[in-house]
């Protein structure tokens, strides 16, 4: 699959990713376009362009505002390992690259985008409980080749690929501060802001966190966990619940599904743990030297006097990994306390992995479970914006899925495989 476009008298060729030929160039592009989960990093390293200058204007405005503010800490994420890890779980997935240049020996990869078509729940009383939805992610354009329409060409070709495979809607995610990305998708391509999940993280301490007395925690086998989630998260009550939920729960990177129950049996909580340390590397940047020194001193003191149980945290200013919590549900008067105990249990599991420094969840802020998840402000981000587009505008849609907000009681499921 190849699409050739002439831009500013230079040939731009969009084609499928060739792992043997393109892997080094794509890895270098990812490093140059490092993405922040929050703060100014996302605005400075915006990774999209709209091809007609609108993004450039927004970018200039963002930079002007950024200069007036003091440098702040940002949580940055970099994909490691398999470049297709975030889409490979879908039966239909692709990675497209944009080549810039005319002469074969001088061509270089200047853009990349990933796309997949998956079957997920839409929520509500629909004729079909599951629909085919495309997910566009990982759009990167080389900083030295922006404002040339390369991002536009990549998105357009990715949408065409998804439509050809029966996708009814397309989704993408960015951050509120990434004005260029929002301008590209909501302006040129007609996406509408849709949902605002919140990233909630907590550092992994050197010491175990307590599980409340009277709370029993046990692990469910994958087949039992699938049956439990089928009752707790029916398709009509959840958005983006994957049709292959049993496969997700049985995946080798799902470390387990855990349930906590109270002594009286009137309340319970459940969550699953996903190991992302093999595919994602996070790092906190922009921290003051004094803070770095203080946390280093605290770690040294904790190593020398572990009986003090000081709340020391790993070195988060170097690349580290994370465990992701998904499928968080609770019920009963003691549900929040039980869910908090499960989060502590997940933290204690993470302590056994030296590569894991954070336990986190991506969850809708209006979900009651969000209030029960332990958080550290520096590891939280409420800037995420999900956008959606109907890929079949000619078909009448009586229930506009993009119309905000979702009805009360509808849960947003965030697939950890695509984080």
Curated annotation (Swiss-Prot):
Q: Under the cellular component aspect of Gene Ontology, which terms does the record hold? A: nucleus
How does this protein assemble?
A: Interacts (via C-terminus) with HDR3 (via N-terminus).
**Ranges of Basic residues compositional bias?**
58-68
What broad class of enzyme is this? transferase
Name the protein family.
Belongs to the acetyltransferase family.
Pfam families annotated for this entry? Acetyltransf_1
**Protein name as catalogued:** Acetyl transferase GW6a
Task: Name the tissues where it is expressed.
Answer: Expressed in roots, leaf blades, leaf sheaths, shoot apical meristem and young panicles.
Where is the segment annotated Disordered? 44-68
Location of this chain's protein in the cell: Nucleus
Entry keyword set:
Acyltransferase, Nucleus, Transferase, Ubl conjugation
Description of post-translational modifications = Ubiquitinated at Lys-63 by HDR3. Polyubiquitination of GW6A delays its degradation by the 26S proteasome and enhances GW6A histone acetyltransferase activity.
Q: Which EC number(s) does the record attach to this protein? A: 2.3.1.-
Any idea where the N-acetyltransferase domain is? Answer: 12-210
Further facts: Over-expression of GWA6A enhances grain weight and yield by enlarging spikelet hulls via increasing cell number and accelerating grain filling, and increases global acetylation levels of histone H4.
Under Gene Ontology molecular function, one entry of this record is: acyltransferase activity, transferring groups other than amino-acyl groups
Q: Which residues form a coiled coil?
A: none
The cross-references to InterPro entries, in alphabetical order and at most eight, read: Acyl_CoA_acyltransferase, GNAT_dom, Plant_NAT
């Amino acid at each position: 699959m190849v699409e050739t476009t002439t831009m500013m008298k230079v040939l731009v060729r969009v084609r499928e990713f060739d792992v043997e030929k393109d892997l080094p160039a794509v890895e270098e592009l990812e490093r140059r376009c490092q993405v922040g989960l929050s703060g100014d990093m996302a605005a400075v390293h915006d990774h999209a362009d709209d091809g007609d200058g609108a993004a450039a204007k927004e970018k200039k405005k963002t930079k002007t505002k950024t200069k007036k503010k003091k440098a702040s800490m940002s949580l940055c994420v970099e994909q490691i390992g398999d470049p297709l890890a975030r889409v490979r779980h879908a039966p239909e997935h692709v990675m497209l690259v944009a080549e810039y240049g005319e002469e074969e020996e001088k061509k270089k990869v200047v853009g990349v985008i990933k796309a997949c078509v998956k079957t997920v729940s839409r929520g509500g009383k629909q004729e079909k409980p599951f629909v085919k939805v495309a997910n566009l992610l990982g759009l990167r354009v080389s900083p030295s080749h922006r404002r040339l329409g390369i991002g536009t060409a990549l998105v357009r070709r990715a949408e065409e690929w998804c439509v050809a495979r029966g996708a009814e809607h397309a989704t993408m995610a960015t951050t509120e501060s990434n004005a260029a990305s929002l301008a590209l998708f909501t302006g040129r391509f007609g996406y509408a802001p849709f949902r605002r999940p919140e990233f909630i993280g907590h550092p992994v301490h050197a010491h175990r966190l307590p599980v409340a007395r009277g709370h029993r925690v046990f692990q469910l086998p994958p087949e039992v966990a699938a049956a439990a989630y089928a009752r707790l998260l029916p398709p009509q009550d959840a958005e983006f619940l994957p049709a292959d939920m049993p496969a997700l729960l049985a995946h080798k990177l799902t470390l387990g599904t855990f349930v906590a129950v109270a002594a009286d049996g009137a309340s319970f909580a459940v969550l699953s743990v996903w190991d992302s340390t093999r595919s994602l590397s996070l790092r906190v940047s922009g921290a003051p030297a004094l803070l770095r020194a203080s946390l280093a001193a605290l770690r040294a003191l904790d190593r020398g006097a572990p009986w003090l149980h000081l709340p020391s945290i790993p070195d988060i200013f170097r690349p580290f990994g994370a465990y992701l919590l998904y499928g968080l549900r609770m019920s009963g008067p003691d549900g929040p306390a039980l869910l908090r105990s499960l989060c502590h249990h997940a933290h204690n599991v993470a302590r056994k992995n030296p590569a894991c420094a954070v336990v986190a969840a991506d969850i809708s802020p209006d979900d009651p479970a969000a209030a029960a998840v332990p958080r550290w402000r520096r590891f939280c981000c409420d800037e995420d914006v999900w956008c959606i587009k109907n890929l079949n505008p000619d078909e009448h849609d009586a229930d506009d899925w993009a119309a905000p907000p979702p009805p009360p009681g509808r849960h947003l499921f965030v697939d950890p495989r695509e984080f």
